[in-house]
Amino acid sequence: MLARQLIPAIRDELKKLDAEPRGARASGRRAAMWRAQQHAVRRGSTVDDLRRYCLQSLRRRRFLEAEDENDYLRGYREGFQAVLSQIRRVETQRV
């Protein structure tokens, strides 16, 4: 399955963020979703590629322990987690 099929779901999540109050956390979520969307639009990118990209982004050392994490980084992590949730949702509907 091509990752492009997830772009409408990612856009829906971004629209929901537009309705929320602006702040560092929302900005971090938006940044993560934009990055995931840009990865999904690449030619030949599969859902597995997108999942791997999100998981690699979550593993990076820039993420601190929960108590030391600032709002932007927390939102960034939550954004990638939201994309992973969309991937799971699409895959379970497909089966």
Go through each PLM region and give its residues:
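Terminal, compositionally biased segments
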Residues: 1-2, 93-95
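Compositionally biased, intrinsically disordered low-complexity regions enriched in proline and serine
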Residues: 3-6, 40, 54, 64, ...
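Generic low-complexity segments that are intrinsically disordered, proline-rich and/or Lys/Arg-biased
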Residues: 6-9, 22, 38, 94
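Charged, low-complexity interaction regions
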Residues: 16-27, 42-45, 62-74, 92
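Amphipathic alpha-helical coiled-coil segments
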Residues: 35-49, 79-94
